Amino acid sequence: MISYLVLQLRFLFLGIAEKLGPKKEKAPAVPSPRLRYRVHGSTEPHGYIEVGRLSWGSIEKILANLNRPINEFENILDFGCGTGRVLRNITNSDQTNLWGIDIDSTTIRWCQKRLHGARFEHIDPNPPTYFNRESFDLIFSISVFTHLDERRQNQWLEEMRRLLQPGGILIASVHGEHHRELHSRELDMMSGFVFVDSKRRFFKKDGLPLFYQDAQHTKQYVLENWSRFFTIIDYVERGIVDHHDAVVLTKKCSN
């Protein structure tokens, strides 16, 4: 509880200092220290901006390897957009419809007020969403499946399959084997998927729901289980900012 209160005071004082401090011309919109911590795990503003930029760069690299430039896509969805730190980096989007969705109403309200060029909507923690079937030809989801248990993960994979157009691309990040904290034997005993329920405290520092914890996958688990929902095009180890593994998927023709 003490560490929680100390963190809240830090949010308060940093927020006051930033409001009273000098304003930089043409500086990118940056959320409050509290929201930066929620989506980035740190209050440091430069790192927040840079990780968002690098994450989008990682996605662009994956698409380039598929010979699918960003201007080829008409409807793009950022599933679990948070404060839009990745989506905001899409610049060549005049002919593209950009959407960001998240279960966090606070971050969505911030995006709606501060970020332009995309539509941001709050969604329920449980699928389905209100979008029509096959609404998007590109969906990306950074640092979402890294925090869901297996049941929720499968529910949202099913929903992403419903939303993705045939031939569309889904790029989702996972905590791969290099990131795991458990011994490999423990992962094997758990069939390659571990949900680490280590943040279930009364005072949860990040302000996110209690079900939002830490999930770790092996590559073999993803290949065997996610192929029930999609055709797996590629699995790029450390493909997102040299940290998360990137799973590259497309919709099965039979669907």
What residue ranges belong to the model's regions?
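A short SAM/SAH-binding and catalytic strip from SAM-dependent methyltransferases
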Residues: 138-151
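A short glycine-rich, Lys/Arg-flanked "PGG" loop and its adjoining helix->strand segment in the class I
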Residues: 154-166
